């Protein structure tokens, strides 16, 4: 039995948010959790309270992709629903690549997870005393719980409040993880290197949990926040972790497309409640591509919009279609989607009188660090949870509102971690502190090079590995990214930091230290993530789920397998049956 479902609501005095200048960073924890979205927060809460836990986030605990999640969290709790139906829908959406055992575990644990969240104080919407359930695309039943259209914010706010009340959890904000710290003889993960307070330090841990979210910022069009730079996947890959299914990226069909506006996600729940997807003539064109129309799986709807614009728009790259909410009763719109109404109003759109301009954008990464049902990776002592992990649940295409659920169900597995599971390390003395120095003009030139790379890379990846891909553009993009990786490695800061020995601290004394070192680290991570996605997309010579190739437009039974990569080696691996 999994004990986390009876998580107590702790009532310790609420501490202030701590800045790095206010704390003394310990040199060792029992467990380090990197990332403070839903996966990281819930993992930290579920870890035994006897363990000393460090929760590391490069921003604040109030900023993550989970906080942006609108639609909700799926669970089969209705009388006419069941985990078996939830399993069927998830497998159907996954286009033949779901690991059945992982899907069964997810759906069967979902109702108890909802009970746990309610007990912790998450205020889901209700109809009277009953939890309100809505329908989303590719679900056969109303099973999506929500808190208006800001479910992610409600979940993360509640979890953050609980985390800050736990005396065994120390939250370290604005600290940037740079690399894993492996024991050279055993290959065990014994901690991380990270940047904080203008210095690089090494922190030991009996276990490291990566919960850093996705990598949407590698694409020019994305619904992800700026923090989503694929840090966990890149860090794990460089350390030798096995990664899985990196070519599968979910492009959300309906992101707000307005000059000057962020690509704000218009939740799938809007279409589930009855909104229509129409073209400039007001025609519901999605039915040309799938019998379910705008309620087809996300990859189908995204390609429908892409194909329709390619055929009808003068400039498909900047064109859009329309999402018309007017078929939904006005009172329901105000009740269910107040944030969407508010954001659209901010950009001059009255959803009660006119449709919303929308187009697809990168939204969710199905691939990630390969894990088992206990979140273990191939590196002893290293775990991964949430979007940064590949559990086998989503297959080639994630079912709507299964992402928050995955964070909670698999984060809960860390409740079973015991002191006996923690890697015991031999203490080694820290090496003398090195100082990074650079000429002012050279530093300015380096800043300019990083900024140019950061601007060019997402455009290249969007054009070559976006909704539709083919070998010719992938090959050119791979060669370009390799060249940029070489340019990045030749930077003075790269040469200095990549030459560090384990447990060798660094002090940095140059202007804008925090901002510039973060730019350096994120740019390096995005270059690696781009390379991995491009190579994985070229490796899979078929179309399936979130991976569509113009030169191989159909699924191939020989490719009903996972793609795995370790370092620079790619290979196929069979899916896991129940």
Swiss-Prot record:
RNA-binding listed as a keyword: no
Sequence positions that bind FAD: 36-39, 58, 65-72, 231, 387, 403-404
Cofactor(s) of this protein: FAD
GO cellular component: a single term: cytoplasm
Single GO molecular function: nucleotide binding
GO biological process, one term: 'de novo' NAD biosynthetic process from L-aspartate
The entry's keywords: Cytoplasm, FAD, Flavoprotein, Nucleotide-binding, Oxidoreductase, Pyridine nucleotide biosynthesis
Keyword Oxidoreductase: yes
Pathway(s) it belongs to: Cofactor biosynthesis; NAD(+) biosynthesis; iminoaspartate from L-aspartate (oxidase route): step 1/1
Principal EC category: oxidoreductase
Descriptive protein name: L-aspartate oxidase
Source organism per UniProt: Nostoc sp. (strain PCC 7120 / SAG 25.82 / UTEX 2576)
């Amino acid at each position: 039995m999994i004990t986390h479902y009876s998580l107590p609501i702790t009532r310790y005095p609420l501490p202030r948010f701590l800045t790095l200048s206010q704390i003394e960073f310990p040199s060792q924890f029992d467990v380090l959790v990197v990332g403070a979205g839903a996966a990281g927060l819930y993992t930290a809460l579920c870890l035994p309270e006897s363990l000393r836990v460090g929760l590391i986030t490069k921003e604040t605990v109030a900023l993550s992709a989970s906080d942006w999640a609108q639609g909700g969290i799926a669970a089969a709790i209705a009388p006419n629903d069941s985990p078996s139906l939830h399993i069927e829908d998830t497998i159907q959406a996954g286009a033949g690549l779901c690991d059945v055992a992982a899907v069964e575990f997810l759906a069967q644990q979902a109702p108890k997870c909802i009970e746990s969240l309610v007990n912790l104080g998450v205020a889901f919407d209700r109809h009277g005393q009953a939890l309100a359930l809505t329908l989303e695309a590719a679900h056969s039943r109303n099973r999506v719980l929500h808190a208006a259209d800001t479910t992610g914010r409600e979940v993360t706010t509640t979890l953050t409040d609980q985390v800050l009340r736990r005396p065994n959890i120390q939250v370290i904000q604005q600290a940037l993880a740079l690399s894993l710290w492996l024991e050279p003889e055993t290959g065990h993960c014994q901690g991380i290197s990270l940047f904080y307070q203008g210095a690089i330090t090494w922190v030991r841990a009996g276990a490291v949990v990566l919960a850093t979210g996705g990598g949407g910022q590698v694409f020019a069009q994305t619904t992800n926040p700026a923090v989503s730079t694929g840090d966990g996947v890149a860090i794990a890959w460089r350390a030798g972790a096995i990664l899985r299914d990196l070519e599968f990226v979910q492009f959300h069909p309906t992101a707000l497309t307005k000059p000057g506006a962020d690509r704000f996600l218009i939740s799938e729940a809007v279409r589930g409640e009855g909104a229509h997807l129409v073209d400039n003539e007001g025609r519901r064109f999605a039915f040309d591509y799938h019998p379910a129309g705008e309620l087809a799986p996300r990859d189908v709807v995204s390609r429908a919009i892409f194909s329709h614009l390619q055929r009808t728009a003068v400039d498909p790259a900047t064109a859009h279609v329309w999402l018309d909410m007017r078929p939904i009763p006005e009172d329901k719109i105000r009740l269910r989607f107040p944030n969407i109404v508010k954001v659209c109003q901010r950009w001059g759109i009255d959803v009660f009188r006119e449709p919303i301009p929308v187009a697809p954008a990168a939204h969710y990464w199905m691939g990630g660090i390969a894990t088992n049902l206990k979140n273990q990776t191939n590196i002893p002592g290293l775990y991964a949870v949430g979007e940064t992990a590949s559990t086998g649940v989503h297959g080639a295409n994630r079912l709507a509102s299964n992402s928050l659920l995955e964070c909670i169900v698999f984060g809960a597995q860390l409740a079973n971690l015991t002191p006996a599971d923690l890697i015991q390390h031999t203490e080694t003395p820290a090496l003398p502190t090195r100082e990074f120095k650079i000429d002012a003009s050279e530093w300015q030139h380096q800043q300019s090079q990083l900024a140019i790379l950061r601007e060019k890379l997402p455009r290249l990846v969007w054009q070559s590995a976006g909704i539709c891909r083919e070998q010719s553009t992938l090959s050119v993009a791979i060669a370009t990214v390799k060249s940029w990786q070489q340019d990045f490695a030749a930077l003075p800061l790269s040469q200095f930091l990549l030459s560090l020995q384990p447990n060798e601290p660094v002090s940095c004394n140059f202007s804008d230290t925090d901002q510039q070192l973060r730019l350096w680290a994120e740019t390096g991570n995005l270059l690696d993530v781009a390379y991995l996605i491009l190579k994985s997309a070229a490796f899979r010579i078929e179309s399936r789920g979130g991976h569509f190739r113009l030169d191989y437009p159909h699924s191939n039974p020989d490719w009903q397998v996972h793609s795995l990569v370790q370092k620079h080696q790619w290979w196929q691996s069979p899916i896991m049956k129940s």
